[in-house]
């Protein structure tokens, strides 16, 4: 996330060119490259978690994330080590991507399996809620740094501070995860599938994986548009101050944190389907008009209003989407299947949202074009929801031939 916030500064440090657009694009493409590793992480680490347990897997993913984040934070720039600088930064992003490929799935499934009956949506929503805490933390640091550092200091070394501060939290997170108990549902399972069995089951359910990817695309594109890309869009495109852009990002993170548990709890009451259909439709129809209104007279107030509107879409859709994805996956490969679908969406669509948005604006000259990218994501989510909740569509474990238990516990529509 921090990488996306400071893409322009990181681009100048590791990808120096005479063309500012080229430098920014190289940085954003490196940001996106980490997401290409997520499907691989979902396969390898997801299988590990489905076989060895949730707790062990969450410790492993945290260790990998720590290595990737710290390596980028301490990496010398291009002027110091030349070609090795961008090469090693890309490597750090790949390690981050490998870990992140199963982080969301591992935590979401853990929360789903420890949730009390009838409150699964509320419990699982806190996985995404924890991401918003990171967004808020990064934005607060960004606001502080922009207030005390000159622009040249921020570009030279200030962007490293959030990465290093984030790395300092790792020991605390290790202690927290080490204290977690394994879920009763996993302990009760008599059969622990091998990696080959897990991969075979995932591939057998390829249609479910594709639909899960489409379902998740709405979430990932919206999230990275309003968080990772927001500071770049506000500063480089709308020419607002860094303080204004980061303040909007902070407000968006707080708004996300409010909407997610509320809508997760609401999905426990009314079902996942109505909320998914409603907010994917809003994501399809409203983004371009909202951004067109914003760019017609750019201001802090309008950027804040647009950001909060998209935050409402993200929080409301994601509050029911993540738990729904845990419910439709085959039981024995719940982490692997969830993570693979989620990682495909992030790797192919969400992670490259900042780069795609920048390219669309550069090629067309239309600063509202990112809205069409978000509308495309909304269409993906709406289509997947209608198919997955259609009468007769079967979810669940291929091996057992029955739907995932959670689908029966809670109403889908």
Which ranges hold each PLM region?
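Glycine-rich segments within core transmembrane alpha-helices of 12-TM secondary carriers
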Residues: 122-146, 341-353
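Hydrophobic core of transmembrane alpha-helices in multi-pass small-molecule transporters
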Residues: 81-101, 300-316
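Extracytoplasmic gate region of multi-pass secondary transporters
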Residues: 3-4, 206-255, 349-354
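Helix-to-loop junctions at the C-terminal end of transmembrane segments
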Residues: 42-54, 260-271
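C-terminal ends and interior cores of transmembrane alpha-helices
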Residues: 16, 63-81, 281-297
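C-terminal transmembrane helical hairpin of 12-TM major facilitator-type secondary transporters
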Residues: 274-320
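Cytoplasmic membrane-interface "Motif A"-like loop-to-helix N-cap segments
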Residues: 51-63, 269-280
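Extracellular/periplasmic helix-loop-helix junction of adjacent transmembrane segments
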Residues: 6-38
């Amino acid at each position: 996330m921090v990488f996306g916030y400071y893409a322009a500064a990181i681009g100048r440090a590791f990808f120096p060119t005479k063309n500012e657009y080229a430098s920014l694009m190289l940085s954003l493409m490196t940001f996106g490259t980490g997401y290409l590793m997520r499907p691989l992480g979902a396969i390898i680490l997801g299988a590990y978690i489905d076989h060895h347990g949730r707790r062990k897997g969450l410790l492993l993913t945290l260790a990998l994330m720590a290595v990737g984040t710290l390596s980028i934070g301490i990496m010398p720039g291009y002027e110091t080590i030349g070609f090795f600088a961008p090469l090693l930064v890309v490597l750090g992003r790949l390690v981050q991507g490998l870990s992140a490929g199963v982080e969301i799935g591992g935590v979401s499934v853990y929360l789903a399996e420890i949730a009390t009956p009838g409150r699964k949506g509320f419990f699982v929503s806190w996985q995404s809620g924890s991401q918003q805490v990171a967004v808020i933390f990064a934005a607060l640091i960004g606001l502080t740094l922009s207030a005390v550092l000159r622009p040249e200091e921020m570009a030279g070394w200030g962007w490293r501070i959030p990465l290093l501060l984030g790395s300092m939290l790792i020991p605390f997170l290790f202690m927290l995860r080490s204290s977690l108990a394994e879920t009763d549902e996993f302990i009760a399972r008599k059969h622990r599938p091998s990696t080959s069995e897990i991969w075979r089951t995932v591939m057998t359910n390829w249609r479910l994986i594709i639909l899960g990817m489409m379902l998740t695309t709405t979430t990932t594109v919206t999230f990275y548009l309003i968080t990772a890309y927001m500071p770049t869009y506000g500063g480089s495109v709308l020419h607002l101050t860094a303080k204004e852009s980061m303040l909007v990002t902070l407000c968006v993170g707080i708004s996300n944190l409010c909407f997610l548990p509320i809508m997760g709890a609401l999905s426990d009451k009314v079902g996942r389907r109505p909320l998914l259909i409603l907010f994917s439709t809003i994501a399809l129809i409203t983004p371009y008009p909202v951004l067109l209104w914003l760019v017609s007279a750019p201001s802090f107030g309008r950027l804040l209003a647009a950001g909060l509107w998209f935050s409402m879409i993200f929080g409301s859709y994601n509050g029911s989407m993540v738990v729904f994805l845990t419910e439709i996956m085959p039981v024995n490969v719940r982490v692997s299947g969830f993570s693979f679908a989620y990682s495909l969406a992030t790797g192919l669509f969400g992670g490259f949202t900042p780069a795609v948005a920048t390219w669309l604006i550069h090629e067309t000259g239309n600063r509202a074009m990112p809205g069409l990218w978000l509308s495309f994501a909304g269409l993906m989510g709406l289509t997947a929801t209608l198919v997955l909740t259609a009468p007769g569509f079967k979810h669940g474990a291929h091996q057992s031939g029955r739907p995932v238990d959670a689908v029966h516990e809670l109403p889908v529509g």
